[in-house]
């Protein structure tokens, strides 16, 4: 319980400074698991999805709510409840939700064979295991995404295979979730800066027989964009320094400010060491039409 509420507190502190965040919930015990407190058994994932969602909605950023991504491994025994959570109108309205699919699950869905869920998900000796129909659960994911636009899917084994930072997992760069809109997978306390290049703007003589894409200009601008993004990291670090100065100068007792101060110190260190950036594209459809 302590870790769950620590995440909630850190989320609120981040969002009050106009930040967004992604949480992976795969560490939470499945519903019905024994716990050593007065509740005796765990309530599972869904109540905590609601808690994090409500925190996002409650902390306004200049009148706008924060941004939150919740994810869970398909290996988790409560993943089906997670997948169904937003099918009820009014539930988990403050978060995007995505399910992390592994190669084993996708192969089982194709072959029509059972798939084993367990908790803890990466344990060699799990305390809980169950078999499910992978094909049926995959069809439910597709149906729910069609019906409510969620959950999103993260092909997690592919993400990890192609993730350069995971070469440094032993140094704290093990990828655990994504930013709120899912563009970039990140490790705990890491942050991202994203820039999109408008492809339509590189179409010369659009909507004519002489239309062509200016690859040379595009190549030049991609290099400049990445250069700019690296500079933005340093600007962000300066901003975090000012945030920490503001926290230090606030009149509250140090024990009240400690969680937020430690949080921003972790983000500052991870941002400076990892220097994560993302350069993407937009207006691909307009480019093709032109």
Language-model-detected regions and their locations in the chain:
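Active-site cavity-forming subdomains of large catalytic enzyme subunits
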Residues: 1-221, 225, 234-248, 263-270
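Core structural elements
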Residues: 231, 235-237, 242-290
């Amino acid at each position: 319980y302590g870790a769950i509420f620590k995440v909630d507190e850190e989320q609120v502190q981040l969002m009050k400074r106009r930040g967004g965040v992604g949480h992976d919930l795969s560490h939470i015990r499945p519903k019905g698991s024994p716990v050593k407190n007065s509740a005796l058994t765990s309530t599972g994932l869904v109540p905590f999805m609601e808690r994090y969602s409500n925190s996002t909605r409650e902390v306004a950023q200049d009148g706008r709510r924060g941004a939150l991504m919740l994810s869970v491994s398909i290996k988790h025994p409560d993943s089906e409840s997670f997948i169904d959570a937003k099918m009820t109108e009014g539930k988990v309205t403050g978060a995007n939700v995505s399910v992390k699919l592994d190669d084993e699950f996708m192969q089982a869905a194709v072959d029509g064979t059972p798939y084993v869920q367990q908790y803890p998900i990466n344990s060699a000796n799990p305390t809980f295991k169950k078999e499910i129909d992978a094909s049926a659960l995959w069809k439910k994911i597709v149906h729910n995404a069609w019906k409510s636009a969620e959950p999103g899917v993260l092909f997690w084994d592919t993400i990890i295979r192609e993730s350069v930072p995971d070469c440094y997992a032993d140094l704290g760069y093990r990828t655990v979730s994504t930013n709120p809109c899912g563009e970039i997978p990140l490790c705990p306390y890491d942050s991202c800066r994203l820039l999109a290049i408008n492809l339509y703007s590189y179409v010369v003589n659009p909507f004519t027989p002489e239309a062509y894409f200016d690859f040379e200009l595009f190549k030049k601008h991609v290099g400049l964009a990445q250069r700019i993004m690296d500079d933005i990291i340093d600007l962000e670090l300066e901003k975090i320094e000012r945030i920490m100065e503001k926290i230090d100068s606030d009149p509250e007792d140090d024990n009240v400010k400690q969680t937020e101060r430690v949080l921003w110190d972790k983000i500052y260190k991870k941002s400076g060491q990892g220097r994560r950036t993302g350069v993407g594209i937009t207006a691909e459809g307009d480019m093709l039409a032109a």
